[in-house]
């Protein structure tokens, strides 16, 4: 056999440039780049070294012969001419892979059969002994590639693809192949950062592929050091002594690398189902001293290396089905950008994404972009220096600043507008900022009295809201009977609900008073009239309470208790955030740490988001409406919370009846009345309270707490419940000053086991 061989190194599309640099560094000569491959010349030592050390190649193919081919007979005889007795035993096993078409070969299976037949015929002995086919673990894996009338016959030295390092026996739903992960790390500058003693963190680490590949690079570990079965193991041209020499050298380098102080390499994953598989992969790779994986949400990501060193944040955020709709993904990317700006200043970041447009929503410029392919999906690698001059997002005003501006009837010249999104989650270009002082309209005597009451309420409640950091609150609730309105502030927006007047009231007078109020509201609250939304609130029945009022599909981001929530001020009677339950949500946030939280009739799951913020071990939210569960999903994503927060669509009573899980903290806020095509029968809170609470208490873990609330003004708690459970009415503790004027806004109870 020759001392020098032609080699083909195959790789994923897009890695050719990196692979040729790596291969030349490992000794490949006369290297040339091809589509998804690199070609060059090497001796046997270099071929072995490429198998052992290439982090990027899929396969190392040793070319046995090239020959022209016009038809299937040329193929057969070209393969037959090879001295196969120099390569394998007559009783050995083989597998054949065929690629390309033409020259009478239009079916790769047929082409592979012709190659196999030629090899078998060449090696068949007079006694009938002949090679057999083993597609899984053959002694020799033969590859023939047909390229423009030329057949290239090769021996696959690698055996199984080199990306299969052996440590990743458990993986997530959409993993990166190991060699693609290594390529991303190399493009991201990790070898340089690691050589300088830098840190690495992955806020969405899945089962830890980036982490393991990064540690192997930093510790100088050959990626295939632990592989036991190779394509050359049973090859008759194999030189075992040469291979042992190279393997021993690689083993010594790995031992020396692992003897060094470990770098700080950490991964965080929201999905609790992936934590142990990720740790198992790390342990199989022998890197438990270098890598730690923790459960954590993107919204709380904050790398804190032991010596405060900087380094690389690298991640592969979802860009397909992992989180659901586009809006959820948008919020996730925005949240990732926010955490980079807030917690990773002076770090470098690398974001690998199949949705580059979402990458633009992170609020940080990328100084370099590289194109890759993840299978058949085109992707981009965005490289970022996390420095203030790279930030492209403005600062939001605080609640205190907004309240001062209201009190002083001024607006800051550089005010950042409230973020708004359409139903697809895309930002809406904000309207020009309103003038600092709202133009004064002539008010009637009644209108002036109404304005005075609004200003008085705003002054009193504004101080409380400022002190408590509350941005959304009720400023007026039918305080004056003739002006029967509920008025809520949502940051810089005013949400007005008109209570339908009784039939005894003259409709014309009621209309005139409404016009008086609408004229007074912008002046009294110092808002532009375009930011006042008016609705009529009537007694609701059935599903009417959930029907659309309009179809603008615009969502506004607000803040409450350290979290962000989406409200829709136009499309539904309610906005997606029940302001009267603010104290209950804060209570849940304070009590949720380490607990399994269940939210029944969850609406947009705002209480569940508070529970997640408070450190709940898990949250489960159940509602019949897909619309509100989609909204809930966006609320979670907006805060960087993800898969450990379950959203279940279904009839609550039926769901509870079939549920077998236990929960430590349960919140139930049912509607007064509900019916739907998707539920059996009709729900009536007064009639069905006993069945509802019995089913829910059956799911309460020992020592757990259930909170029950509803807003049916005539509701009476069934006396039989007090005999079964320890029940304490806590209504007064769940009403803030902005709802103190309406003592019947809701009632609430704390329920525990006796």
Curated annotation (Swiss-Prot):
Its EC number is 2.1.1.173, 2.1.1.264. Residues 46-157 form the THUMP domain. CDD domains: AdoMet_MTases, THUMP_AdoMetMT. This is Ribosomal RNA large subunit methyltransferase K/L. It holds the Pfam family Methyltrans_SAM. Keywords: Cytoplasm, Methyltransferase, RNA-binding, rRNA processing, S-adenosyl-L-methionine, Transferase. Belongs to the methyltransferase superfamily. RlmKL family. The keyword ATP-binding does not apply. InterPro entries: 23SrRNA_methyltr_KL, DNA_methylase_N6_adenine_CS, RlmKL-like_Mtase, RlmL_1st, SAM-dep_methyl-trfase, SAM-dependent_MTases_sf, THUMP_dom. Specifically methylates the guanine in position 2445 (m2G2445) and the guanine in position 2069 (m7G2069) of 23S rRNA.
């Amino acid at each position: 056999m020759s001392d020098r061989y032609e080699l083909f190194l195959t790789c994923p599309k897009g890695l050719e440039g990196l692979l040729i640099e790596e291969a030349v560094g490992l000794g490949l000569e006369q290297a040339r780049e091809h589509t998804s491959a690199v070609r060059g010349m090497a001796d046997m030592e270099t071929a072995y070294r490429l198998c052992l050390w290439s982090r990027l190649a899929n396969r190392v193919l040793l070319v046995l012969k090239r020959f022209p081919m016009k038809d299937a007979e040329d193929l057969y005889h070209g393969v037959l001419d090879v001295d196969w007795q120099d390569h394998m035993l007559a009783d050995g096993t083989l597998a054949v892979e065929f690629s390309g078409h033409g020259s009478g070969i239009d079916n790769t299976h047929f082409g592979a059969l012709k190659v196999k037949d030629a090899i078998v015929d060449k090696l068949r002995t007079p006694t009938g002994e002949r090679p057999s086919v083993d597609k899984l673990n053959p002694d020799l894996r033969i590859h023939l590639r047909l390229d423009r009338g030329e057949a290239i016959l090769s021996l696959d030295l690698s055996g199984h693809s080199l990306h299969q390092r052996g440590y990743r026996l458990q993986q997530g739903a959409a993993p990166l192949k190991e060699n693609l992960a290594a390529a991303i790390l190399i493009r991201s500058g990790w070898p340089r950062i690691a050589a300088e003693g830098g840190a690495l963190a992955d806020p969405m680490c899945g089962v830890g592929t980036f982490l393991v590949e990064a540690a192997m690079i930093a510790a100088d570990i050959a990626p295939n050091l632990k592989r036991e079965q190779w394509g050359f193991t049973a090859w008759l041209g194999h030189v075992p002594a040469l291979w042992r020499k190279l393997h021993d050298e690689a083993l010594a380098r790995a031992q020396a690398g692992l003897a060094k102080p470990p770098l700080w390499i950490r991964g965080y994953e929201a999905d609790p189902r992936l934590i142990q598989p990720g740790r198992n992969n790390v342990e199989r790779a022998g890197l438990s001293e270098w890598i730690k994986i923790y459960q954590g949400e993107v919204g709380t990501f904050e790398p804190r290396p032991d010596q405060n060193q900087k380094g690389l944040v690298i991640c592969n955020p979802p860009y397909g089905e992992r989180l659901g709709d586009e809006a959820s993904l948008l919020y996730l990317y925005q949240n990732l950008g926010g955490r980079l700006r807030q917690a990773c200043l002076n770090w470098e970041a690398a974001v690998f994404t199949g949705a580059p447009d979402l990458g633009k929503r992170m609020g940080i410029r990328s100084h370099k972009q590289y194109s890759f392919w993840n299978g058949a999906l085109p992707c981009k690698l965005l490289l970022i220096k996390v420095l203030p001059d790279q930030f492209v997002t403005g600062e939001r005003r605080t609640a205190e600043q907004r309240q001062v501006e209201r009190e002083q009837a001024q607006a800051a010249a550089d005010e950042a507008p409230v973020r708004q999104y359409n139903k697809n989650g895309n930002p809406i270009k904000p309207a020009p900022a309103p003038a600092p002082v709202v133009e004064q309209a002539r008010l009637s005597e009644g209108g002036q009295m109404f304005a005075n009451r609004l200003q008085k309420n705003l002054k009193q409640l504004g101080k409380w809201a400022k002190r408590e950091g509350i941005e959304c609150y009720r400023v007026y609730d039918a305080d004056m009977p003739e002006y029967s309105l509920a008025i809520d502030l949502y940051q810089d927006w005013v949400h007005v609900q008109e209570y339908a007047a009784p039939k005894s009231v003259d409709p014309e007078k009621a209309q005139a008073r409404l016009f008086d109020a609408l004229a007074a509201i912008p002046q009294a609250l110092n808002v532009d009239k375009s930011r006042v939304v008016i609705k009529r609130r009537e007694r609701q029945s059935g599903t009417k309470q959930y029907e659309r009022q309009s179809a603008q599909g615009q969502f506004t981001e607000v803040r409450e208790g350290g979290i962000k929530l989406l409200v829709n001020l136009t499309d539904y009677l309610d906005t997606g955030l029940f302001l009267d339950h603010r104290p209950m949500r804060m209570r849940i946030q304070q009590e949720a740490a380490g607990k399994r939280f269940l939210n029944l009739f969850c609406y947009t799951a705002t209480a569940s988001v508070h529970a997640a913020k408070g450190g709940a071990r898990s949250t489960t939210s159940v509602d019949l409406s897909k619309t509100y569960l989609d909204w809930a999903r966006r609320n979670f994503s907006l805060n960087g919370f993800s898969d450990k927060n379950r959203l279940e669509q279904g009839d609550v009573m039926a769901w509870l009846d079939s549920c077998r899980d236990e929960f430590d903290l349960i919140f139930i806020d049912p509607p007064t009345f509900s019916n739907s095509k998707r539920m059996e029968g009709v729900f009536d809170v007064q009639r069905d309270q006993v069945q509802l609470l019995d089913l829910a208490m059956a799911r309460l873990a020992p020592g757990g707490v259930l909170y029950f609330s509803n807003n049916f003004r005539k509701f009476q708690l069934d006396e039989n419940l007090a005999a079964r459970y320890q029940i304490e009415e806590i209504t007064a503790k769940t009403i803030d000053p902005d709802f103190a004027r309406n003592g019947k806004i809701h009632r609430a109870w704390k329920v525990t086991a006796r």
